[in-house]
Structures are given as C-alpha cells and as structure tokens.
Amino acid sequence: MKTLDMLKPGENAVITGINGQNTSLRRRLLDMGLTLNTKVSLVREAPFGDPIELEVRGYSLTIRKSDAQLIEVK
C-alpha cells in the first residue's frame, strides 16, 4: 500500500482511500478536496520534510506528513 507521504516532489498519484479512525480529521481532509479518485501532485516538502505542499484540483494545499500517511494512493 502506497500512501501520499511516500511521493517524491514532482510525482503524481490518484487517491484510492483514506484510513484512520478519527472522523473529524477524515472530514477535514475530504473538505479540503482530498476525495477518492482525485489526482494529486507533490509539489515540494518543507526543509525538514514536514509539511508537504500538494497540488489538488488546480490549487495548492499544505498538509502535515502525519495526515498524508493516512491517504492511500496509486
């Protein structure tokens, strides 16, 4: 299983699932546009690897690497 935090800058992927028991975090990720079958691209990582900047649906989104670990991609 590959997760969003495993992408390298410039790589693209498609979201296949969101894991985790925390429903408020899951809802927040969905509200930010991180839904199933959405194409995402890792733009860059912060100097120490956290957070990461994504391009989702034509806009930039920055999330924590710990949150990215919950998002399955292919």
Regions found by a protein language model. Name each.
Residues 46-74:
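C-terminal structural segments of small proteins and small subunits
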Residues 24-28:
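Short alpha-helix capping/helix-loop boundary micro-motifs
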Residues 5, 16, 71-73:
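Intrinsically disordered, low-complexity, charged/polar segments
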